[in-house]
């Protein structure tokens, strides 16, 4: 059996809702759905994610809306970033943010979860948003490079775990590398 993992940069979850993203959720209902650029306060994210649960249930993907596991990290800078992750698979663990990054600009950019596949394997899935840098603004570039360095460290940890027989990892997102 395979699982479906989808990633979407929604460019604002409230705008995506106005455009009918909940209909897409009900039609496609991926096993894991990584979302970037949520750009909304927690209350708005919670209510929209609840609607996604109803869409998954209506589509027959889950028995009840509460069976859709939702996690997100809003950005502490209003109107910026924000990542989410929805899954109907069993959640084994959740982690928010990257270790060592505590500045507001680094919030809402990384969440990961360990899920159990129908075959019983555990995998790590991360929803990632790497902000765009701008060489005209050295501070923003320094922030981006610091985030990328920390992300590379975490990616190395995930790689090493997989190489030693541990969980495989899937990173989904908007990486803004160029």
Please report, for each region that a protein language model flagged, where it lies by residue:
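A short secondary-structure junction signal
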Residues: 136-141
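Long, well-ordered alpha-helical scaffolding segments within enzyme catalytic domains
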Residues: 143-155
């Amino acid at each position: 059996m395979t699982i479906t993992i989808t990633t979407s940069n929604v460019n604002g979850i409230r705008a995506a809702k106005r455009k009918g993203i909940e209909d897409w959720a009900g039609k496609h209902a991926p096993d894991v759905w990584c979302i970037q650029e949520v750009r909304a306060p927690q209350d708005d994210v919670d209510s929209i994610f609840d609607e996604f649960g109803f869409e998954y249930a209506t589509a027959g993907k889950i028995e009840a809306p509460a069976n859709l596991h939702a996690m997100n990290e809003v950005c502490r800078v209003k109107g910026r970033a924000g990542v989410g992750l929805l899954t109907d698979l069993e959640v084994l663990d959740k982690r928010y943010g990257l270790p060592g990054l505590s500045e507001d600009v680094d919030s809402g950019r990384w969440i990961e979860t360990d899920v159990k596949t129908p075959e019983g394997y555990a995998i790590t899935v991360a929803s990632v948003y790497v902000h765009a840098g701008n060489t005209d603004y050295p501070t923003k570039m320094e922030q981006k490079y610091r985030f990328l360095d920390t992300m590379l460290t975490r990616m190395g940890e995930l790689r090493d775990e997989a190489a030693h027989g541990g969980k495989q990892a899937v990173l989904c997102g908007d990486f803004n590398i160029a």
